[in-house]
Amino acid sequence: MKEIIVKNSKIRLVQGDITELSLDAIVNAANSQLILGGGVAGAIRRKGGPIIQEECIKIGGTFVGGAVITTGGDLKAKHVIHAVGPRMGEGNEDQKLRNATLNSLKLLDEHKLKSIAFPAISTGIFGYPIDRCSKVMIKAVKDYLSGDTQIGEVIFCLYTTSDYEVFDKELK
């Protein structure tokens, strides 16, 4: 496990299953319709129970680069922040991923929450390269934590060893 300090906040790397983390919020790599399908979203749907998808349906969707918050249902995390990352090839992907990351952190602050875990957004079926993902997301988090925030801890939770190693090289 690797950790760095930015101002008054910690950024940590963890390898494992994001749905097993006991935090204020975990981030779901969502689609713009907020339908919990496969990947991280599927794991959240299976372990969190139907209430999360029901809340997503009530919200109705959000834009690429946007984020919305729901309850954590039966998960260990209190909330799920559904961040919509870009699909590779749609254009302006780096900025959209940065926005999804920043909008997730803003929601955390707005709800006076202190801890959050991100997966590698858009690197699954959306086809975004893991090395670019690590650069964009880590820089966005560092930039946000350098400002005025109450966030105490940001975790990047990577499912595979290879993804963890890519983020490990980038986090310095």
Region spans (language model):
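Phosphate/ribose-phosphate-bearing ligand recognition and processing surfaces
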Residues: 88-172
